[in-house]
């Protein structure tokens, strides 16, 4: 046997052994094709089918950061105590918010079944004043209006089948007729409270006419119903290409008062939208004469109910939005009520990139009856004229 034969034989033996070991190796199974989420475009963009169901789901929300300065009465400022000498002084009002939203939709034999939820998480200080020391105690109890986590709020959580909606919503007194413009502080003169549980029915005739009837629980000390009798809201709207005319009427079952609003929206140009809204409400049972014994309400409403929150019987709001270009818009609002409260708000909103908007706003409030004994302070103003500004950064998704 020569060396060549020996080498060939050794190589053959090695190949045989390797083949035997390869035959004993574990065979890795081919990965099964992944089942990707299916897009649902029935209800708009962003929806997808929940796997194994016919329900479409969308998840969204926004992250927001507000920086405010100025007077507390403008809703933009804050006050604090100096940590060294205890003097009260101005400071920034700051608030960071994360809002989570969900939408679902599914077609059924009774119509579209929809849900909507919105939950808000906030961190910051308050648009308010520091807490003064309690002279009845020996301990120093200065509260300098510190920043911190605030209460989580459930702003929406409703179910709707066809035109029937039940759950947590905002009052149809506001949602059906529309809010008071695209300014950030649109309630310098308030136009109605918001949070409530509802049982409501919405009807769309398909020819521009729509209507709503809403049974509402209200919220807060003044607004929450005190019996089995709900608050009632009714509304009627006519919408066309030029704009819309809307009216709403509300019955406050706690104080047995009625309030209503009428609104006109017009679009005179493609890049300009304008609105004017007027409100009127009865308030005999909302005004408390605390100077007379047994001549006031058990719960003092201060002239402002759940629906008629403006001062006096009447109020109006007007404003609009002018789109300067595809990234920039100008928004303004003016409001006034019978108690001589004048609110003015204006801002510039700029879309830095799609989904990220920066808004700079200036707000002014003149509380005409500030010096009167019966002045009802809605914005917590500490003087007749308040002015402030707010800078908002918001990433929506």
Task: Please provide the spans of the model-predicted regions.
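Outer membrane beta-barrel
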Residues: 46-69, 79, 83, 87-220, ...
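Solvent-exposed loop segments that connect transmembrane elements
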Residues: 75-84, 128-146, 220-227, 281-313, ...
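Detector for outer-membrane/organellar transmembrane beta-barrel domains
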Residues: 234-345
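N-terminal periplasmic/intermembrane-space "pro-region" immediately following the signal or transit peptide
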Residues: 1-64
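Hydrophobic, lipid-facing positions within transmembrane beta-strands of outer-membrane proteins
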Residues: 96-100, 152-157, 195-199, 230-234, ...
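Repeated loop/turn-to-beta-strand initiation elements of outer-membrane beta-barrel proteins
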Residues: 109-112, 163-166, 207-213, 242-247, ...
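Transmembrane beta-barrel strands of outer-membrane/channel proteins
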Residues: 63-69, 117-121, 166-170, 213-217, ...
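Outer-membrane beta-barrel "beta-signal"
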Residues: 350-352, 364, 383-397
């Amino acid at each position: 046997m020569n060396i060549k034969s020996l080498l060939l034989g050794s190589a053959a033996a090695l190949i045989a052994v390797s083949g035997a070991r390869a035959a004993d190796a574990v065979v890795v199974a081919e990965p099964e094709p992944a089942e990707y989420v299916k897009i649902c475009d029935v209800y708009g963009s962003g929806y997808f089918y929940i796997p194994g169901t016919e329900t479409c789901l969308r998840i969204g929300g926004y992250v927001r950061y507000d920086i405010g300065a100025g007077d507390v009465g403008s809703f933009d400022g804050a006050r604090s105590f100096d940590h060294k000498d205890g003097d009260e002084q101005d400071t920034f009002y700051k608030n960071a918010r994360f809002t989570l939203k969900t939408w679902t939709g599914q077609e059924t034999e009774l119509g579209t079944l929809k849900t909507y939820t919105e939950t808000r998480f906030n961190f910051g200080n308050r648009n308010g004043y520091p807490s003064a020391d309690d002279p009845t105690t020996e301990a120093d109890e200065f509260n300098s209006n510190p920043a911190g986590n605030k209460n989580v709020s459930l702003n929406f959580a409703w179910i709707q089948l066809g035109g029937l909606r039940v759950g947590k919503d905002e009052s149809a007194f506001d949602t059906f007729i529309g809010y008071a413009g695209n300014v950030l502080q649109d309630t310098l003169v308030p136009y109605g409270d918001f949070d409530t549980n509802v049982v409501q029915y919405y009807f769309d005739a398909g020819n521009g006419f729509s209507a709503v009837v809403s049974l509402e629980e209200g919220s807060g000390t003044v607004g929450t119903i005190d019996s089995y009798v709900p608050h009632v809201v009714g509304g009627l709207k006519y919408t066309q290409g030029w704009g819309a005319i809307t009216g709403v009427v509300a019955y406050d079952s706690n104080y047995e008062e009625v309030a209503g609003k009428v609104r006109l929206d017009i679009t005179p140009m493609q890049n300009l939208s304008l609105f004017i809204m007027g409100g009127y409400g009865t308030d005999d049972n909302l005004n408390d004469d605390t100077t007379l014994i047994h001549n006031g309400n058990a719960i003092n409403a201060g002239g402002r109910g759940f629906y008629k929150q403006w001062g006096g019987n009447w109020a109006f709001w007007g404003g609009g939005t002018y789109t300067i270009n595809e990234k920039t818009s100008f928004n303004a609002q003016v409001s006034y009520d019978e108690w001589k409260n004048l609110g003015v708000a204006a801002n510039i909103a700029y879309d830095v990139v799609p989904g990220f908007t920066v808004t700079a706003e200036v707000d002014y409030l003149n509380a005409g009856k500030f010096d009167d004994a019966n002045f009802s302070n809605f914005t917590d103003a500490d003087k007749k004229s308040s002015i402030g500004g707010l800078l908002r950064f918001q990433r929506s998704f």
